[in-house]
Design a protein with these regions (language model features):
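Conserved, single-site charged/polar hotspot
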Residues: 1-309
Length: 309
């Protein structure tokens, strides 16, 4: 029934992120339990539109404006349906083949290149955390405009060349959009291309433009190491670097507001911590690491190839 609901206690959210914590969550739909390798996996069986009601109020706050929530609904619906169409169901649901086509690795003696996608999801479509999309139950959908946003955009998706767009998103891009092939897999998408998160307003035409010839409007060549270092060590003005507490409290959930250095940040590790982290992430024991050398960057300046010495 549409009114069926259940509650789960001590659900971990923000897995492996600095905001990781536990909370009680309530869900619509039915609960399916799978027992595998002496572990229980809970799967929420729910229709897409009810799922999205939770997603848009988990990824952002239910107090955001109607238009922001509507935009998020279209983006999240597009991503979900694009992902569902892109991975063969026989592979996704075959527990004997967890390392499917979405988990691609090319290795040589001196080079490890791997794209991580959804290889862990062999029993369900998407997970409930930041790895896919936040889905934190109906308690997040605390305002009526969340339901209005879903109803107003019902069935709407973004398309390109007749296909649903894989509309991946982030809360803060660091000032520049990255291209798909430098983050996810070696498949460029024309609708996910490099761009600066900033526009110049022309009062004569009332136009917002990315035009590079206007001061501050263009994106430097961030594949160049010197340009990338300058970009990273400074704070070029983007839309996503706001310190306006009113705006942040309107669009972000409470625990997201705890992170104030989301645009430019710094982490420090000891040699032992760095070695342990790389071993955990890559499965390779490099021993004592004495240097990290940038080899190749994407169009936003993010590293996609790194030399470990």
């Amino acid at each position: 029934e549409a009114t069926d609901a259940f509650e789960l206690l001590d659900v971990t959210i923000g897995i492996n992120f600095h905001w990781e914590r536990k909370e009680d969550q309530r869900f619509l739909g039915s609960l399916k339990i799978i027992v595998e390798n002496k572990k229980l996996t809970g799967i929420n069986v729910i229709n897409v539109e009810d799922y999205l009601t939770s997603v848009i109020s988990s990824e952002m706050s239910a107090t955001a404006s109607l238009e922001l929530l509507k935009a998020h609904a279209v983006i999240s619906r597009s991503w979900l349906l694009a992902i569902d169409n892109s991975i063969d169901n026989s592979l996704r649901h075959d527990s004997a083949a967890p390392n499917n086509a979405a988990n691609c690795q090319l290795s040589t003696v001196n080079c490890q290149l791997k794209w991580y996608e959804r290889d862990a999801h062999t029993r369900f479509d998407v997970c409930a955390d930041d790895h896919c999309q936040r889905y934190q139950g109906i308690t997040r959908a605390s305002t009526e405009i969340v339901k209005q946003a879903i109803a107003a955009t019902r069935g709407q998706v973004l398309t390109s060349d007749g296909k649903i767009c894989d509309a991946r998103f982030s809360k803060c891009c660091g000032g520049a959009f990255e291209e798909f092939q430098y983050c996810w897999e070696d498949t460029p998408h024309p609708y996910l291309r490099k761009q600066r998160d900033f526009r110049i307003f022309n009062p004569k035409t009332c136009d917002l433009s990315f035009e590079a010839t206007r001061p501050g409007g263009g994106l430097p060549d961030l594949t160049d190491e010197q340009e990338a270092e300058t970009w990273i060590r400074t704070s070029p003005p983007p839309f996503c670097n706001t310190t306006n507490k009113r705006i942040l409290s309107q669009v972000l959930n409470n625990y997201d507001q705890e992170t104030t250095d989301f645009y430019r940040w710094k982490m420090e590790y000891t040699q032992e911590e760095l070695s342990a982290l790389i071993l955990k992430r890559s499965g390779i024991d490099y021993g004592q690491i004495i240097d990290l050398v940038p080899i190749a960057r994407g169009t936003s300046g993010r590293l996609w190839k790194l030399k470990i010495v």
